[in-house]
């Protein structure tokens, strides 16, 4: 389950993919399998996939316990060929983030 609280030390990777028309489902299926693969990495917390309503984007919101764990997850995915293969589904725009503010009702 995602943890969205400020100043926890948790690292959030937000990766926005642009996909060709009709390409969301294939990418979502692929990213779900990649998340299952990554989930056994120490420090991995969660992955959440989002589809845009206009059909042009998929967002992967993934969390790890620390910067070191984020690096391990990325290296494991790279070594397993997952990062190279995802290029067939769309263009990735990844970034690592820290939550700095939240507001809840």
Where are these regions (language model features)?
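An amphipathic, aromatic/His-enriched active-site/gating alpha helix that lines ligand/cofactor pockets
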Residues: 2, 6, 33-45, 63-97
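Surface-exposed coil/turn segments at beta-strand junctions on protein surfaces, enriched
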Residues: 6-8, 20, 40, 53
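Short, well-ordered beta-strand segments in beta-rich or mixed alpha/beta enzyme
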Residues: 11-18, 46-77
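Short, surface-exposed ligand-recognition loops at beta-strand->loop->(often short) alpha-helix junctions
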Residues: 16-30
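Solvent-exposed, flexible loop/coil residues
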Residues: 48, 93, 105
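Hydrophobic transmembrane signal anchors and adjacent membrane-proximal interface regions, especially
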Residues: 56, 84-85, 101
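Short, low-order "capping/linker" segments at domain edges
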Residues: 98-105
């Amino acid at each position: 389950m995602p943890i969205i609280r400020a100043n926890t030390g948790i690292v959030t990777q937000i990766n926005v993919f642009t996909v060709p028309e009709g390409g969301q489902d294939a990418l979502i299926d692929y990213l779900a399998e990649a998340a299952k693969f990554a989930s056994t990495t120490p420090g991995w917390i969660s992955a959440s996939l989002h589809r845009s309503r206009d059909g042009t984007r998929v967002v992967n919101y993934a969390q790890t316990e620390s910067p070191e764990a984020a690096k391990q997850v990325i290296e494991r995915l790279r070594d397993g060929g997952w990062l190279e293969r995802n290029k067939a589904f769309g263009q990735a725009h990844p970034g690592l983030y820290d939550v700095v503010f939240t507001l809840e009702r």
